[in-house]
Amino acid sequence: MVIAFLARLAAKLFWRVRVSGEPAPLFGRRVLIIANHPHPLDAFFLGCCLPVRPVVLFPREELRSFRTRLLARFFDHETWDINDPMTVKKALRLIERGRIVAMFPEGRVERAANVMKIYEGAAMLAMRSGASLVPIHVEHREDRGFGDTRVQLHIHSATHIDPRRQAGPRARREAGARELAATMQAAAFRSHVAQGLYDAFLDAVQRRGRRTEILEDMREEPKTYGDLLKASLAIGRWLARYTQPGETVGVMLPNMFASVGAVLGLQCQGRVAAMLNYTSGPHGIESARVTANLRTVVTSRAFVEQAGLEPLIAALEGVRILHLEDIRQEFGVLDKLWLVGFAMRAPRLVRVRVNPHDVAAILFTSGSEGRPKGVALSHAAMQANIRQIATVLDFSPADKVLNALPMYHVYSFTAGVWLCLLTGTQLFLYVSPLRYRAIPEIAYRRDATYLFGTSTFLGFYARHAHPGDFGTVRYVISGGEKLGEEVAKTWLEKFGLRIFEGYGATECTVISLSTPLGYRQGCVGRLLPGTEARIEKVPGIERGGVLHVRGPALMLGYMQYDAPGLIQPVSSEFGEGWYRTGDVVDIDDEGFLRIVGRVKRFAKIAGEMVSLDQVERVAAAASPACLHAAVLKLEAAGGETTVLFTADPELTRSRLLKAARALGAQELAVARNMIHMPEIPLLGNGKTDYVRLMELVADDSVWATRC
């Protein structure tokens, strides 16, 4: 007992181990602790620091370390081969005798924060023991500074896994491993404590160190956390002179270091950043101004001149326009003394404290089906989504993300910027996704390991890239639109890279994501931890239905043009807190999501429901090198018909019929009408501009080009 007490005291003093959560689940009749394994000393921490004394099972190879062998004398343990059935039987006997057993189902020390492979031997032990599973999430925070290493053991509620519905022992083991992984992912996600985004950024600065390189833009001058901290404090102080606490401030800036500094500066001063889509034209900008009730917009003179955005500035009549170039003249000597002598030394004393459930940012829907709406995202929601992604993807400080998607796109803003800032993953921001030759070259020169893009942009990159340009890339993640089959095939054949498709919406950021451990062709992965889903059946659609989701990453509500600045809480047919995505989705027995199409993009023709997305897939199969888009047209008799816009001047209906037969699609999936045009109109985020196409369908002069 004395030795155990001294071991626990040493752990708390030297490693600052802290235990959180309700310990009651540990005192059950049969208890099996499942824990992640981020550090070689985790077995020692579990064995000595919990309110119970478990028998810790850990891999035999970890005893090669002298430190581990020394510390193993202070707690009960067993070495085991996670694939050996005899070892599993030994652990079962321990549980049957009433001992509490702790194990690491991943079988090794983790590479990153995500949950890795779960061994079937661990799942077998969890199933056959009949024990209550108590997830414990182990978190290491190695801050810069003596004695600042902190270890947190988060105890979560007990659960059970029950894969008995699966037929066959192997299927049950595989299902058990999936349930075990989902349990550990949920524990990792729930261990996160929400705070203000700027506080989370300061935590990352402290954890990684101010000299650590974190951000690079097209100037190719690496910037450190310290550079970003200084920029955020300076820009924040300058912006605070022209704005009020809690005010929504428009941000119209490209993907640059100063843009990230401006967003962080607004967060530092307790302002709300409204990310403006500068490709939406004067009408779109004016709509966003009214919707978000903007009085101030921050931009750059150089950006406005180079991008030709003068008409957008003119549309912001009555709005104060702040240019980042002016900070050099307006940031005086006293400001610089404040920055260097006080703010940089104690940034937490100058930042404005915020409620994590207050609005952090406003993004706008794409407007592909009507007037854009403002989407209010809270600090807690954005951090929740970042945490969800980090539990399924192995981001680490050794990675470098190449992100060319504009920050007004939620996919780019959350996963492409904030995730990197808060996890310490290096980020390269490129100013435009439209430079199809430059982006592959940057990936080659800067050793990018992650590439974010939409299907449209990824297709163009593949067309212009050299086979060696993406040699260092580990993950290519597609989002924002349906991944084209031809695009996925091209990337696999030309670069040897599988594209992992994500699915989400501005209203709830990323909902599901394909990963190496959760991949099925034609699907968009499984729901992220903490996200719930329900399906609303649609008459005429046999498989799947409209997806409704609920979770911690959901928006606070919409802002509408006719109710400026007012946040309208989200709800759906299933009640408050549920969001109706409008997408028809089919979820299989293993939890994989398959997107069937938008519910608004189904036509009833000859008594059958026809998906416009299927019409586009047939066109893509017939002419994979060109873009195509399908819309509905109301006929004079009151029915509906399909219209295909194509950039292929040689595409004919006979080719479409041949492609439909090859795909096994019904003949109704071949468009009744076809219009050739030089290029398909796109929005700034790469999505098809269906509003513009509907306007063209209504224009009689366009039908002169009909085939």
Feature map (PLM): residue ranges:
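Non-catalytic C-terminal accessory region of glycerolipid acyltransferases
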Residues: 86-204
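Conserved AMP-binding/adenylate-forming
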Residues: 238-280, 404-406, 609
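AMP-binding/adenylate-forming catalytic core of the ANL superfamily
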Residues: 297, 451, 551, 556-557, ...
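Conserved C-terminal "lid"/linker of ANL adenylate-forming enzymes
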Residues: 320-326, 603, 630-634, 643-645, ...
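Conserved pre-ATP/AMP-binding loop-to-beta segment of ANL
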Residues: 321-324, 328-364, 370-371, 394-400
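Gly/Ser/Thr-rich phosphate-binding loop
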Residues: 324, 448-453, 462-521, 532-534
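Conserved AMP-binding/adenylation subdomain of ANL enzymes
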Residues: 383-400, 410-449, 464
